[in-house]
């Protein structure tokens, strides 16, 4: 308020300025007016300097929080993360990697240890899923191989699940991700079994799911080579001697990350 009072008083005395210059007896009053004008200049300088900085108040590009993308993960023990914590599951580690790049996710997992293709479908039907999802991952088949089920039956049931996955992704095959079956022949659990035979059978099952995925344009992540590194690195195996450790799941997530990022970018 004091600043505005000074401003008003200066304008009130402006008309007398020329007269004051001609009358030396009023020199003190002239000095007072000059002082008043100086205060007026200072007042405007302070007023401008106190104005908000519009450039700094604007949001920084890239810091705007986007809604979380919805992710549905379908599978068996390799998706639910048997013998590891929830945070160590590969879908959760994938979500963590995305979060580090400011991409948040909302994960729904439908998976259980021991499930075959037909049991996964039963499990899906028992859940109240809410499509469409921004991303759907599918990893299934190891228990079909383990139980000795016919590979042609696996082909039919996998194709059915693959098309359901595309349906859950709003009909967009590019928003579905298929992972290969890891090779459990390299684990301590298989030490008393025919490891070579197991590996060959898994290769055949993986050929089926890869060809099915490529036929409909679904991205494919081959994690089988990573699982075979366990023969020289026991830290890639969980304490149960059969399933992957959190360390191996981290490698899966890292391999899937660039593909998933491309999926999310292309689906915008």
Model regions: which residues?
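Serine-esterase "nucleophile elbow" of acetyl-processing enzymes
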Residues: 51-113, 123-132
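Intrinsic-disorder-associated, low-complexity terminal segments enriched in Asp/Asn/His/Tyr and depleted
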Residues: 16-19
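Alpha-helical cap/lid subdomain in secreted, periplasmic
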Residues: 122-268
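Extreme N-terminal basic, low-complexity initiation segments
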Residues: 2-7
């Amino acid at each position: 308020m004091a600043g505005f009072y000074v401003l008003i008083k200066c304008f009130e005395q402006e008309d007398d300025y020329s007269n004051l210059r001609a009358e030396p007896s009023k020199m003190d009053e002239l000095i007072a007016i000059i002082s008043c004008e100086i205060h007026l200049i200072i007042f405007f300088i302070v007023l401008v300097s106190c104005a908000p900085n519009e450039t700094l108040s604007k949001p920084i590009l890239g810091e705007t929080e986007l809604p979380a993308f919805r992710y549905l993960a379908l599978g068996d023990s390799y998706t639910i993360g048997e013998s590891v914590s929830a945070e160590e599951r590969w879908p959760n580690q994938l979500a963590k990697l995305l979060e580090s790049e400011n991409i948040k996710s909302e994960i729904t997992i439908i998976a259980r240890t021991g499930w075959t293709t037909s049991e996964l479908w039963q499990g899906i039907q028992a859940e109240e899923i809410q499509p469409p999802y921004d991303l759907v991952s599918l990893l299934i088949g190891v228990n079909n191989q383990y139980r000795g089920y016919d590979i042609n039956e696996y082909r039919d049931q996998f194709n059915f699940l693959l098309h359901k996955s595309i349906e859950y992704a709003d009909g967009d095959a590019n928003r579905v991700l298929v992972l290969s079956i890891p090779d459990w022949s390299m684990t301590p659990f298989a030490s008393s079994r025919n490891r070579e035979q197991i590996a060959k059978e898994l290769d055949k099952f993986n050929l089926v799911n890869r060809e099915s995925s490529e036929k409909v344009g679904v991205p494919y992540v081959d994690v089988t080579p990573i699982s075979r590194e366990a023969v020289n690195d026991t830290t890639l195996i969980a304490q149960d001697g059969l399933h992957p450790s959190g360390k191996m799941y981290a490698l899966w997530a890292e391999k899937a990350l660039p593909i998933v990022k491309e999926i999310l970018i292309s689906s915008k």
